[in-house]
Structure formats: structure tokens, C-alpha cells
UniProtKB/Swiss-Prot annotation:
SS bonds (residue pairs): none
Protein name (Swiss-Prot/TrEMBL): U-scoloptoxin(25)-Er1a
UniProt GO cellular component terms: extracellular region
Example of a GO MF term: toxin activity
Major localization listed first in the record, in broad terms: secreted
Family per similarity comment: Belongs to the scoloptoxin-25 family.
Tissue: Expressed by the venom gland.
Length: 120
């Protein structure tokens, strides 16, 4: 064997086991540890036995979050409707335009009361 044939054989002998196991030389050791921790966490979650109480608590918390979102969305929608129908910043708006002036009106009942002298 010549040296040119021996070099690829030596590379294959020393580097081959890393590729067979799925590990490469450029992959750092801490990534392998992190992936093993993640695999362990996933199997722990998969092996967890969920009781009916756990499931009902989870459902209740999800429903509560959805209700809060619904209330906020409804409030925002009603506020946007009110803002579109009524302009509070209108300069021409006068508080007293909507009310008629009743101060000068005299009712028939009031006239009768003026003529009557109360005993007290």
C-alpha cells in the first residue's frame, strides 16, 4: 500500500465511529448535554399521569384567560363605537344646546299656589 491509499483508511478508522453514532467532531459537548436534558424533560412530560383534577384546573385557567380577553375586546369595541358616534373634542359642541330653557315658564298650578295664602 502506498501512502496515498493509507491516509484515507486511517481517517476512516479514527473518524468513522463519530459518524456512526451520529456525533460529529464539530458539535460541542455542551450541545449534546443540552439535547439529552431536553429529551429527558420530554420523556418526563410524556410519562406524567394527568389526573382529572389537573385537567379541570387547566381547563378552568384557559377559560378564565379567554373570558378576560373577551371582556377586554368587548370594552374596546364598545369604546370605539362610542368614539365614532360622538365627538367629544368638537369645538362647536355646547352643553346647553340640547336643553330648552324652562325657567321663564309658569304653569297653571303655580299661579293658583301664588294666590293661596298658606297658614304657616
Amino acid at each position: 500500500m502506498t501512502n496515498m491509499q493509507l491516509v484515507p483508511l486511517l481517517i476512516l478508522v479514527f473518524v468513522g465511529p463519530y459518524f456512526v453514532k451520529g456525533k460529529t467532531l464539530d458539535r460541542p459537548l455542551n450541545e449534546q448535554v443540552e439535547s439529552n436534558d431536553l429529551k429527558r424533560q420530554i420523556t418526563n412530560i410524556q410519562n406524567t399521569v394527568w389526573t382529572s383534577k389537573d385537567i379541570s384546573l387547566l381547563k378552568r385557567s384557559i377559560m378564565k384567560k379567554n373570558e378576560e380577553k373577551l371582556v377586554v375586546a368587548t370594552a374596546a369595541k364598545s369604546e370605539s363605537k362610542m368614539g365614532s358616534n360622538y365627538d367629544y373634542n368638537d369645538d362647536d359642541y355646547d352643553d346647553y344646546d340640547d336643553y330648552e330653557d324652562y325657567s321663564n315658564l309658569v304653569y297653571e298650578d303655580d299661579k293658583e299656589d301664588e294666590d293661596f295664602d298658606y297658614p304657616y
